[in-house]
Amino acid sequence: MKKNNNGKLRIIPLGGLEQIGMNITAFEYEDSIVVVDCGLSFPEDDMLGIDLVIPDVTYLKDNIDKVKGFVITHGHEDHIGALPYVLREVNVPIYATKLTIGLIDNKLKEHNLLRSTKRKVIKHGQSINLGCFRIEFIKTNHSIQDASALAIYSPAGIVIHTGDFKVDYTPVFGDAIDLQRFAEIGKKGVLALMCDSTNAERKGFTMSERTVGKTFDNIFAEHRNTRIIIATFASNVDRVQQIINSAYKYGRKVAVEGRSMVNVIGTAAELGYLQIPDKTLVDIDQIKNYPDDKVVLITTGSQGESMAALSRMAANIHKKVTIKPNDTIIFSSNPIPGNEKAVSKVINELSRKGADVIFQDAHVSGHACQEEIKLIYSLVKPKYSIPVHGEYRHLKAQAGLARDLGIPKENIFIMHSGDVMELNDESAEITGKVHTGAILVDGLGVGDVGNIVLRDRQHLAEDGIMIVVLTLEKYSNQLLAGPDTVSYTHLRAHETR
């Protein structure tokens, strides 16, 4: 791309549009680039052997001298999960709120990047200067604490990026969304609004997180004599807090299972975002020392992930927890689009084992519905609308809301990943495209697996056989030879992985 010297701001989404996940957007003005979020997405069903998917950041690598930093809206995987991979090639400072930095630090430790990466904690209401940009962090509500919207000030004008948000007047922890600040910035004149589209098809308002706490209380009261197992997102600290509150109220000990759940709860408690009464939390190995009616287990696996703790319990391969008849199992989440089949499979397996599975009324969304989106538009009064965070139908639904609120059709842009939008107060247009794409992470390999290998893995899964040959001593079972493997399939040897 040519150097931007025409007084226009460039907005370049490198992922996160027309999909759920892999959120990352570059904002460029002259010789400054600021990157908002750096998330991953999870593999599709046909991506055999793939652990996760990260965005192709070739554009950032090609313009590394301009990149001033990553600004992160909140600590969900689809907004921070790609950082350990991208930082190896684009190592610039990270700016985020306290809990978000804490969760990022966990990832950087796992990848031995903590010492080599600069991080700075920003409070809501504070601003940072990065090159030509000033970026203000605004308090919002979401299904994880410390979520932020961003007011991005540039010489071309102000852009507000909502991040993932909802309007919750009675949050479990902290303050409600700072609607007053949205209105104050709106009075200054906002060039563009980039707003969360996830629930743009849903009418009304999203319910408060506190309503789930009432549901938990009712379930605990109705199931006093059974063990309770609750699966939810590891990062939903408010949800975990309400589970702990109900467990304490009804005299139950709480155990946690799943590596990500243990890490998040540990970080949140250490930073003061989770209040755990003394002697309430016990190690998973200790639950056998308590009657079933005195135990609550919080676990990962709400999305049916094959290797998550609840899925392993359902398949009878979990080393520490065996599902018992009459266990009460609560799915405190909705399936992410694409995960419905996997979740249904786990529910069926649990039901076959005699468990009472509850998956209704135990979850509320962390994303704004139509009336909340319209409220933000009314406060901000943007000249241009750029729907973000969602599949195409979600982006289109928000575009319709923007039109209903009086924004001209020509000022509404449904962008695609890689589009280059140039805008100022006089005009806005899509002027080009940069290279984007998805990079597949397979174990320790990043970008090593392509479509040909995925196709051949599919062939192997459907039409292949592998034989393992070994020789054992008859009486002692001592290995004498091998193991050797023989495979029969259509794969070409140099493409087999």
Predicted features and spans:
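His/Asp/Glu-rich metal-coordinating catalytic cores
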Residues: 2-71, 76-289, 308-322, 341-344
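Hard-cation-handling environments
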Residues: 207-331, 336-337, 344-359, 365, ...
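Conserved small/polar residues in nucleotide/adenosyl-binding loops
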Residues: 489-496
